[in-house]
């Protein structure tokens, strides 16, 4: 497990030391050649605190300034999220920010792409199974006796079922896993578990695929990825793959008490979005 950063918000604090050799090599590569480094970050739980209503999620107040200070000093910064790209841009407040002129947001696990240069979103047609599940899901949840407080989030190219508002969120979550997996399979989709949420989406869409393609497009010589949830595990696997190909990488976990799997895989663990902000600020200061 990675070590935690301190509680100080002083951007001149020394960088924390990753707990693994591979992580230390990844950080050293970033610092040695920042102009060849790609930094990828999740949105919810990483740049934005987790809230009960995803529509109310917003980037940490200091996240965008920290990104804007760091982005001009590295090859590229990409936000990789399960949200629609345009929604992440709005909730993050990323558009029109000095320092983020070349930011990329890969939405729907890379199926959508927003570039700050153009300010537009590009995307292929949606999978037909998503529309079928969207129509069937309300009645399906009623028939299987889903817990009261379970609710559906429309995500455009995916549909998510949340249990955070249920009386027992974890029990409601576990009760839905098998039925939703069956529903997803019937329509050619898969289920991605998260923090009290199960997302039904097309196969072949994950943060690992998105990160690999973006790193290769950028010709990066090192990669850092920051995430908080089970949906970030494919991105962690992608960094492992890049490491095996000779590209140094650093895995950072935005730690929480809800999800421990990422912390166990990470080179470095920070204290939620606030800790992510501190890390970004410190990196920017180190690269001055």
Q: What are the functions of these language-model segments?
A:
Residues 11-20, 34, 60, 208-288:
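Mg2+-dependent phosphoryl-transfer enzymes with acidic/Ser/Thr/Gly-rich catalytic loops
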Residues 46, 85, 231:
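Conserved Rossmann-like nucleotide-cofactor binding loop
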Residues 147-238, 247:
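Conserved acidic, metal-coordinating active-site core of Asp-based
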Residues 38, 76-78, 104, 224, ...:
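A structural signal for isolated positions on well-ordered beta-strands in alpha/beta enzyme cores
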Residues 1-43, 47-52, 62-65, 69, ...:
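Non-catalytic pre-domain segments flanking phosphatase-related domains
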Residues 96-112, 182, 262-277:
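Structural recognition of alpha->loop->beta junctions
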Residues 41, 107, 227-228:
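Active-site flanking residues adjacent to catalytic metal/cofactor-binding acidic residues
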Residues 58-154:
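Active-site phosphate-binding/coordination module
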């Amino acid at each position: 497990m990675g070590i935690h950063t301190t509680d100080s918000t002083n951007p001149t604090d020394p960088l924390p030391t990753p707990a693994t050799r591979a992580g230390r090599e990844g950080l050293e590569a970033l610092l040695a050649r920042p102009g060849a480094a790609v930094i990828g970050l999740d949105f919810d739980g990483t740049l934005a605190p987790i809230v009960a209503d995803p529509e109310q999620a917003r980037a940490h107040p200091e996240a965008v300034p920290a990104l804007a200070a760091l982005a001009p000093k590295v090859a590229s910064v990409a936000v990789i999220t399960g949200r629609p790209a345009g929604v992440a841009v709005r909730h993050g407040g990323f558009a029109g920010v000095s320092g983020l002129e070349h930011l990329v947001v890969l939405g729907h696990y890379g199926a959508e792409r927003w570039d700050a240069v153009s300010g537009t979103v590009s995307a292929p047609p949606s999978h037909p199974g998503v529309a079928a599940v969207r129509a069937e899901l309300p009645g399906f949840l009623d028939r299987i006796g889903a817990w009261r407080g379970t609710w559906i989030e429309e995500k455009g190219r995916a549909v998510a079922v949340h249990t955070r508002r249920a009386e027992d969120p974890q029990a409601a979550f576990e009760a839905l896993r098998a039925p939703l997996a069956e529903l997803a399979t019937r329509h050619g989709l898969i289920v991605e578990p998260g923090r009290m949420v199960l997302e039904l989406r097309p196969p072949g869409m994950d943060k690992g695929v998105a990160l690999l393609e973006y790193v290769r497009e950028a010709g990066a010589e090192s990669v850092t990825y920051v995430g908080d949830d089970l949906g970030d595990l494919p991105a962690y696997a992608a960094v492992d793959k890049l490491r095996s190909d000779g590209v140094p990488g650093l895995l950072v976990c935005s730690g929480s008490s809800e999800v421990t799997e990422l912390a166990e895989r990470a080179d470095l663990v920070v204290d939620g979005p606030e800790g992510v902000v501190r890390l970004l600020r410190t990196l920017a200061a180190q690269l001055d």
